[in-house]
């Protein structure tokens, strides 16, 4: 199996979900190693000492330690749905929207999700801080079905798992929140075959376990 890249992943991690979606759509096959974050296998830490997932170890031994690098790599090999088939100025706009997600929205999301760990402010205050970004997404989605056009892009896939996390913090609140287009977009992704296929459960990997090919054939 030395000729197949290795993916260290954690099922519910939004960064890992975006990577698995891109890997699955590209068809670039990997050996999936499901990780328990509280008990990381030494092989992961040897491959990438910073200890976050997702991580890909390529066949030549080089390591990708950032989810977006994994997306870029597999889509550069195969991008059958044209997720990155956009003009360079649009790709730059996508990169900005993703960066805002990964930097500020993610921070507000964590504070909202784990509000009990951040007693300085109320859960509602943390949720309100998520609004500027979510409204930006809502504005885009109220004029087109996906963030940058009629069809799915790299940005939709990179951002969707985080909006999903937001929606799950208080599902009742989200169901009546002022984000109808965002809800619709989220619902289409969350019930789509691609997302469902990448959420399959795998047992945590340990040295000596048989390799699990992902996407499975
Ligand atoms: N910038 C990284 C972030 C990855 C990340 O933070 N992953 C979380 C899980 S969602 C993690 O592995 N945290 C380490 C831990 O909880 O020990 C990426 O894009 O891949």
What does each of the following model-derived ranges do?
Residues 202-217:
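Acidic/histidine-enriched, glycine/proline-rich intrinsically disordered or flexible terminal extensions
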Residues 69, 181, 194:
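Residue-level recognition of oxygen-bearing side chains
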């Amino acid at each position: 199996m030395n000729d197949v890249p290795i993916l260290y992943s954690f099922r519910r991690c939004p960064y890992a979900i975006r990577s698995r979606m891109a890997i699955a759509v590209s068809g670039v096959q990997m050996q999936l190693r499901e990780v328990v974050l509280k008990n990381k296998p030494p092989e992961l830490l040897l491959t990438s000492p910073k200890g976050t997932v997702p991580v890909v170890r390529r066949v030549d031994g080089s390591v990708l330690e950032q989810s977006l690098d994994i997306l870029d790599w597999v889509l550069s090999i195969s991008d059958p749905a044209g997720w990155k088939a956009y003009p360079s100025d649009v790709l730059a706009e996508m990169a900005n929207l993703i960066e805002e997600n990964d930097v500020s929205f993610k921070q507000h999301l964590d504070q909202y999700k784990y509000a009990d760990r951040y007693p300085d402010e109320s859960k509602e205050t943390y949720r309100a801080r998520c609004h500027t970004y979510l409204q930006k997404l809502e504005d885009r989605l109220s004029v087109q079905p996906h963030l940058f056009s009629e069809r799915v892009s790299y940005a939709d896939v990179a951002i969707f798992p985080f909006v999903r996390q937001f929606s799950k913090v208080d599902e009742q609140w989200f169901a009546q929140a002022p984000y109808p287009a965002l809800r619709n977009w989220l619902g289409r992704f969350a019930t789509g075959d691609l997302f469902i296929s990448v959420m399959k459960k795998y047992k945590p990997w340990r040295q000596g376990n048989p390799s699990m090919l992902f996407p499975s054939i």
